[in-house]
Amino acid sequence: MRPSGRSAQQVRPVTLTRHYTKHAEGSVLVEFGDTKVLCTATIEEGVPRFLKGKGQGWVTAEYGMLPRATHSRNAREAAKGKQGGRTLEIQRLIARSLRAAIDLKVLGEFTITLDCDVLQADGGTRTASITGACVALADALNHLVSTGKLKANPMKGMVAAISVGIVNGEALCDLEYVEDAAAETDMNVVMTEDGRMIEVQGTAEGEPFSHEELLKLLELARGGIDTLVAAQKAALTD
């Protein structure tokens, strides 16, 4: 029995609240159970130097956690003077994932920055960030079209992410913190809405996992991501 009473394949309750803040071109509060992340999308004219004159846009991301997002307080990284390795890894993952959702040529020379700020962490902060930021990105792109700055929408489709893992020998979908901490295998999977894989990050924390277990985890991830994509699309029609 899982702590939440969920079945092995069941995701936590998912909520995507759009237009959560008033200034950003796209903003979403995403909730995966008790994990809550504020995702905002900011549009800026121009692109990084390495893309100037190439007629395409760019999508980048930043990620951070509020000091008391976890059980005990963590000092702000700004106070330490540098970002940690985990933070850098996660924000690069978010950016890579969301670039797969759009046609950068159609975007033109605009840069969209996704800021993902974890308000409360209970496992799956990076997967919640990707899932929520994709909705914020969609709203930002709709803004570019509705204001006449773009003729066509660059969005190719939704992208979502989920964690899966093996806990006490059982393959589980969407791990909360206590499950993630006890997992023998921990994996994060990012997919397009039609089930193509963007990124798979998997690690055996204890016993190595078999090929059959890998396939089972990917099957669980696909089911979970189907649920998340349905939630994304429902949110965008509200």
UniProtKB/Swiss-Prot annotation:
The residues the record assigns to binding phosphate are R86, G124, T125, R126
Q: Which Pfam families match?
A: RNase_PH (PF01138), RNase_PH_C (PF03725)
Q: What is its EC number?
A: 2.7.7.56
Identify a single GO molecular function assigned to this protein.
3'-5'-RNA exonuclease activity
Listed under catalytic activity are: tRNA(n+1) + phosphate = tRNA(n) + a ribonucleoside 5'-diphosphate
EC category name: transferase
Record's signal peptide: none
Q: How does it assemble?
A: Homohexameric ring arranged as a trimer of dimers.
The role this protein plays is: Phosphorolytic 3'-5' exoribonuclease that plays an important role in tRNA 3'-end maturation. Removes nucleotide residues following the 3'-CCA terminus of tRNAs; can also add nucleotides to the ends of RNA molecules by using nucleoside diphosphates as substrates, but this may not be physiologically important. Probably plays a role in initiation of 16S rRNA degradation (leading to ribosome degradation) during starvation.
Name the record gives this protein: Ribonuclease PH
Q: Which organism is it from?
A: Erwinia tasmaniensis (strain DSM 17950 / CFBP 7177 / CIP 109463 / NCPPB 4357 / Et1/99)
